[in-house]
Amino acid sequence: MKVISAEALAKVATYGAIVEALREGFRADIATPVRHHHETSAVSTLLLMPAWSMEWTGLKTVVVKTDNAVKNLPTVQASYLLIRNDTGETVA
């Protein structure tokens, strides 16, 4: 699995490239079910957002921790898994 840093992403994700990727994504045949929303505690929410096409599966996970400000941490913590459908391998 490859972990992509914000710095590495910023070097290749130009505004034009992002707009074109979004255009292609909206035209593609991609399944995007309603996100899962789970209150895991009084101060924590888990969001799961799956999507898939013939070639790829993606899963965005988000945890919203309303008490993180007092810990000097971001309220929203998130990650994205990209999986090859032909092998099941997590690639990023």
Predicted regions mapped to residue ranges:
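N-terminal ligand-binding/catalytic initiation module
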Residues: M1-A92
